[in-house]
Amino acid sequence: MLAPLFAAAVLASSGGLSASCDLEHPSGKAGCTRAAVDALKMNQLQAMGTHNSYKMAIAPLEMANLRARNPKAADTLDYSHIPLTDQLNDGARELELDFVYDSKGGRYTTPLGRKMAPATTPYDLAAMSKPGMKVLHVPDIDYRSVCPLLVDCFKEVRAWSKAHPDHVPILIIFNLKQDQLKVPGAVPLLPFDAVAMDAVDAEIRSVFKPGELITPDQVQGKHATLREAVLAGAWPTLKRARGKVMLAMDESPEVVAVYRGARKSLEGRAMFVNTDESSPAAGYITLNEPIKDNARIQAAVKSGLIVRTRADADTWEARKNDTAPREAAFASGAQYVSTDYMHPDTRFGPYEARLPGGGVARANPVAGKP
C-alpha cells in the first residue's frame, strides 16, 4: 500500500495520473486515461525487471561440490528464473542477459562443473557448439541458460513483443563476460575487442528489425550528443515507444570505450551504454545500490537519464526478508527495478519484489511532468 503522501507525490509528478494507474493497461477512468498515459515520455515510467534473467539453477551435484568448496559463493548463486516468455507474461519489463564471445563455436561445451559431476541435468551441447554469443553467468560453474544462444533469447523476446504490441518499452541490459575465472582448467575467455563488438551489434540486428528498437541515434536526433538530447527531454512518448525494445550495455568504462570507439556519442550503435552522467554518450546508467545511491539515482532520473537499480542481490534480502533496498529502489525513481524474486522462494521466506499497486508499469514518482 502506498502511503498517502507518496501517492499524492506520484499523482502530482505524472501529469494527473493516479498512483494506481497501470501504464501498460490504462483503465480509461479518471486519472488513468490512455491519452494521458501515452503523453508520458518513456523515461517517466517505473517497471520491474529480473536480474540474470536467463539463469537456470545449478545442478544439484554441482551445487553440492561448489558448496563444499565455497559456501558463500554457493549461497549467492542459489537462485534461478523461469523462461523469458513466462517472465514477460508475469510483468517483467527489464531483462538481463550476460554473454561470452564464441566466434567459432564449441568453446563452452565442456564446463568444469559438468566434468566434476557428469551425471547431472542435461546441457544443450548442440546450441553451445554453434558460433555466436553464448548466454551464461559464470563459465565452468554457473553456465546453464534458458536460452543458451543470444540470438535465441532475442527471438523469444521479439516473438513475445510482436504478440503484445501495446507493451511499455522493454529494457534488456547486458554484461559482456571476459574476465578469466581463476580456477585450474577453466576455459580461456575471448576478449570483446572491436571485432567482437561489431559481432554483438550484428546479432542484435539479425533479429530486431528497424523500428523495433529504441536506439541511441533515434533519441539523439539532431542534437550534438546523446546526453544533450536526453537532457532536452528527447525520449519518445509512451505512444511511440510501445511495442519496442531498448538495449543497454552494463559494463566498465574500459569495455564501453571499445564499443564506442572514436564516436562522439553512440552513432550507429544498437545499444546504449552505462556511463557517468557527464559523458556525451549518457542516456542510460546502472546504479545498483538504491540505499547508498538514492540521491544520485533521483538526480539522474530528474535530469532525464534512464536508470536501472536492484531491489535485492546475492539472495541476501530473500533470506532475511529485508525489504529496505526494495523500498528505496521504488522511491528512488529508477525506471527499472530488478529482482531475483518476482515471486517468493519458499525455501527462504515471503520476500518478493513487485511493483506497488500490482500493475506492470506505473507513473514514475520522481521523473516529473512530460
Can you annotate each of these PLM segments?
Residues 13-370:
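Catalytic cores of phosphodiester-bond hydrolases, prominently lipid phosphodiesterases
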